[in-house]
Amino acid sequence: MNLASIIGWGVGFGAILISMAFTPTGLGVFWDLSSVFITVVGSFSALMASSEVVAVKKIPTYLGFFFRRNSYAKVSIIKILVELSEKARKEGLLSLDDELEQINDPFFKSGMRLVVDGADPEVIRTMLYLELDQMQERHKVGSDLFKTWAKLAPAFGMTGTLIGLVALLGNLEDKSALGSSMAVALITTLYGTIMANLMFTPVQLKLEKIDTEEAAVKTMIIEGVLSIQSGDNPRILEQKLMTFLTPKDRSQLNSSIGGE
């Protein structure tokens, strides 16, 4: 589980609820079922109208990515690439065929399979980058979905406010109810703002971050696979791939190699 996402939502909602509780009216005035209906159902309906059904059905999956802790094991991948490079330099590319079953990453395995099969370097580069591009297009569907929802929620919040104001103006003779009616009219705007800025935008940004990290790992794999095919020195390959690591991961890689 990604504790940062859970803590972020918990602290955010907690801060809002505590702030509401300390108002003179308490929490009760901030709850209105019709406002929830307009904001949540209205924005979701518009989202469905503007998106593919397949994408909308995957909302639970996208939320799962938001709460999941993502680990890409870059150090382990680099170590495997260096080991494969060393073996290829000593025994030839065909000797790597026996090592393919030990590679768990499908993208990594398909790239090495192309190398062992003797595919042209440009063909390998094109195929792997095409697969990377398609992956990013799939990821973009999810982030764009929540980006759209973040735009729609405040709009429907304002719609609810306008509905409330129309109802308020239609009942001006009851002056004792003006204050409470105005409060109810504004609640939908509050709901829309909370949904957009605390719920949907963080999910969108997290999905974009996951896409960036995964694309970086796959780019690293592509460069490593092509270097193995071209017969680069394993130490040069290692130094090149270390540029994809953070200083902390570089230290981990150096210590693991030094301990072997």
Curated annotation (Swiss-Prot):
Matching Pfam families: MotA_ExbB (PF01618)
InterPro entries in alphabetical order: Flag_MotA_CS (IPR000540), MotA-like (IPR047055), MotA_ExbB_proton_chnl (IPR002898)
GO cellular component: plasma membrane
Localisation: Cell inner membrane
Keyword hit for Cell membrane: yes
Membrane protein topology class: Multi-pass membrane protein
Function: MotA and MotB comprise the stator element of the flagellar motor complex. Required for rotation of the flagellar motor. Probable transmembrane proton channel.
Protein family according to the UniProt entry: Belongs to the MotA family.
Complex formation: Each stator complex is composed of 4 MotA and 2 MotB subunits. 2 A subunits and 1 B subunit are thought to form a single ion channel, so that each stator complex contains two channels.
Name of this protein: Motility protein A
Gene: motA
